[in-house]
Amino acid sequence: MLSLIGFIITISILVFIHEFGHYCIARYLDVKVEEFSIGFGKELIGITDRKGVRWKLCFIPLGGYVKIYGYDSSTRIIDKTKEVNEEVTFYSRSCLARFSIVAAGPLINYLLAVIIFTSFYCYFGKVEIPPIIGDVVAASPAERAGLKEGDKIVKVNNKYVKDFVDVQKEILINGFSSSTLTIARKSEEFKVNIRPQEIIISHPEKKKIGKTFRIGIIAKNEPIHTKIGIFGGVLEAINTTIDISTLTLKAISQMILGTRPLDEIGGPISIAQESGKSMASGAQMYLLFIAMLSINLGLLNLLPIPVLDGGHLIFILYEAITGRLPNPKTRNILLQLGAVIILLLIIISISNDIKNLFY
């Protein structure tokens, strides 16, 4: 029950923030908004404000939308079946204005994450764990490579690392491919190649809930705490957001290239489970979960897939460069292709969720 409640609350928060970004910029640019909906299907409750916007909560809490006057949100074209006041429609605005309206949704998701991370950095400070090995897991890739307690990791794949998080990040970015670690041991410095080992994450009832990989090293538990102000907190929050986005993009590219398994894609059941776990762990963990999910929502919406915000941004850029709208037939084909891609991702994610529930 907590997972279901957590899922509904989490999705509602993220969708509201995302659509509110579209709404705010549309209103700022004097584009009329007809509806602001959380959920799909039959309206459960709603109110119309003095500007004529219908704010409503619908039966199926799996998303939401902002309906802009004279603009069909599913096809991204002017609705010719009804009379419209061209002065306040989406397409009456310049390419830059329309680009701003579309981009505002994903960007406000990023802004939410930065605000949450900033508050954590300002309140708790920055914690760094030096990249010094405290222990090596038996029979792990690290042990086979000859790593020992007390070794300091200087570089991973020729990139300098200043703390253990950097080590984890670089190894994650490289996926299941081998990583080259530069190790400092006493006065000696040498390199080792390590290929991560796949491990199964199991539920206490022995049900598999996912896969990950490790090289088998444990950090020496000597964290360094540093207090930082608001400016430093913002910078750290931005860096954290960029790091998470980079890891996500790398994972997506590896899945496309076939070097990373598709069973890592989680769907609504996974989100519900993680929502419930984070809520049960307290407000701090739940806020961090919201921030992580908000980054992923913003990033995925920016992917150049037709029907997503990113695909529509490509259409606007095409118009800005060529001076003409994309060919309607070509546009419709691309929209249908985009819908198929999204449908396939939904099927894969739900299949993974079901498989992880029973196997």
From Swiss-Prot:
Record field: transmembrane: 101-123, 286-308, 333-352
- Where in this chain does the record put each PDZ domain? 104-188
Gene Ontology cellular-component terms for this entry are: plasma membrane
List the SMART domains. PDZ
Q: Enumerate the Pfam families for this protein.
A: PDZ_6 (PF17820), Peptidase_M50 (PF02163)
Molecular function GO terms recorded = metal ion binding; metalloendopeptidase activity
Q: Tell me the leader sequence span.
A: none
Which PROSITE patterns does the record cross-reference, listed alphabetically?
A: PDZ
| Lipid bilayer topology | Multi-pass membrane protein
Task: Locate the residues binding Zn(2+).
Answer: H18, H22
- For this protein, what is the EC number? 3.4.24.-
Q: Which keywords has UniProt assigned to this entry?
A: Cell inner membrane, Cell membrane, Hydrolase, Membrane, Metal-binding, Metalloprotease, Protease, Transmembrane, Transmembrane helix, Zinc
The Gene Ontology biological process annotation of the record reads: proteolysis
Please list the residues that make up the active site: E19
Q: Which CDD domains match?
A: cpPDZ_EcRseP-like, S2P-M50_PDZ_RseP-like
Recorded hits in InterPro entries, A to Z, give: PDZ, PDZ_6, PDZ_sf, Pept_M50_Zn, Peptidase_M50
Q: Which cofactor does it need?
A: Zn(2+)
What family does this chain come from, according to its entry? Answer: Belongs to the peptidase M50B family.
Under what name is this protein listed?
Answer: Putative zinc metalloprotease RP161
Native species of this protein? Rickettsia prowazekii (strain Madrid E)
